């Protein structure tokens, strides 16, 4: 097993975690980013989306309080400086997938939201 990568977070990531409606969801979000840094969990790649922007250097992980329901929440992160030479995991945002909200916020935070251009 490799040494865990250092973690860094967007300035508003902690607020995102605190805004999750339950302590269980908050804990799950923090465990997810820890597992990503350890290399024991890997998200699905994101792509460029015409309504959102280019998130192709980011990944997403679906989660919820229980495993027997469709996950309502997403955590968006990226490996820096890139996936091949990763030296750090950056938590971008965490929140509901509803209406692409979490992806719009990720694109905004990275200065890539299409309506902001």
Language model features with spans:
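Intrinsically disordered, low-complexity, repeat-rich regions
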Residues: 3-4, 8, 41, 108-109
